[in-house]
Amino acid sequence: MQKAGAGGRRASDCGLAPHRPRCITKFAQYVGSFPVDDLDTQESVWLVQQQLWALKDCPRRRAVILKFSLQGLKIYSGEGEVLLMAHALRRILYSTWCPADCQFAFMARNPRSPASKLFCHLFVGSQPGEVQILHLLLCRSFQLAYLLQHPEERAQPEPCPGPTGEVPLKPLSSSGGLVREPFGRDQLSQNVHALVSFRRLPAEGLVGSGKELPESEGRARHARLGNPYCSPTLVRKKAIRSKVIRSGAYRGCTYETQLQLSAREAFPAAWEAWPRGPGGHSCLVESEGSLTENIWAFAGISRPCALALLRRDVLGAFLLWPELGASGQWCLSVRTQCGVVPHQVFRNHLGRYCLEHLPAEFPSLEALVENHAVTERSLFCPLDMGRLNPTYEEQDCGPPGRPPRTLRPLSHAKSEAELQGLG
């Protein structure tokens, strides 16, 4: 029986931390977790996609609170009193989402666990925007953490890429090469006892104890391509009228600033080590476009480095950035089995977006990406919104032979089967 991590701790059990890093709080429903063992990275991704499809109608749900920061991701009970899971960012391998079924999932390993033993944690929301923002927050955290670790690979000063907006993508069809019987619902565990990957993580207390930023801070100054609602105020009012504002997904332009402030607090030494002047961290903070556009362009990092990282990402991962010195033209670089393949995207005289050598036209870049995420024959492979963490560490650096910590079981784990992750 595996007993690692810090599951089930109440905030009062650990005392208050002297400093609570800035975090972004979101709400979701936890479905469960399943193992992803003894597979290479791409096979693990295919398995996760298969399992998300198999579990799309799973009725098991548990309301939880997710807190994002540059240190990692913490999951609390719905009341905010019990810390269920806490994953250091360096132990999270992959993040993905499925808009059609309102699913968000990430793969992570436990402290001192081998790289071949991973768990996938699955969450759902009531609408696509709720889970999309969870995925975007985690992906941008990956990128900002990499930038802080590798300041020498930052992008040189150049015009900021135009916004591309947030895209509700459809799920990809399963890729070939991996066939495995889907997990049954009785094999999906909601016991998070052994699914925690922070080594030592103080609890943050009740909901609202962390620092929150006002919504007005860091509003985007750029107009969204292909979107007539260029004003954040108009976007928000439209969302309120359509009653889909609950998740706060339309406030994505503020999350970039919040994540960067979290980076400054979580890694003060690395932040201060950034060069001053053009291309320094002040330029990074002022890049306050939406999370989607910054993730697509890997904002802040040089293009050669971004392409090198793309070559190591999952099949279908992509970068989208405007061509330098060319108006109305973009480069879409896609990770395929043949390597990274570039495609030219342009805007025609009718204001519609097209991919070179293909007749289809789209009203926005978002629509173009959405189409090629579900169309298998238009490109070498469909686009995939999933992202690998470039700062992922396969093993922990610590004293050799140190046994994993053992903590008391969760109060809701009543049976031996639950403790083994089969309840």
Curated annotation (Swiss-Prot):
It comes from Homo sapiens (Human). PROSITE patterns: PID, SH2. The lineage of its organism: Eukaryota, Metazoa, Chordata, Craniata, Vertebrata. One of its GO terms (cellular component) is postsynaptic density. May be involved in synaptic plasticity regulation through the control of Rac-GTP levels. Residues 296-392 form the SH2 domain. InterPro entries: PH-like_dom_sf, PTB/PI_dom, SH2, SH2_dom_sf. This is SH2 domain-containing protein 5. Interacts with BCR. The keyword Acetylation does not apply. It is found in: Postsynaptic density. Residues 392-423 are annotated as: Disordered. PANTHER family: SH2 DOMAIN-CONTAINING PROTEIN 5, SHC (SRC HOMOLOGY DOMAIN C-TERMINAL) ADAPTOR HOMOLOG. Its main location: other. Residues 28-146 form the PID domain. The keyword Cell membrane does not apply. Keywords: SH2 domain, Synapse.
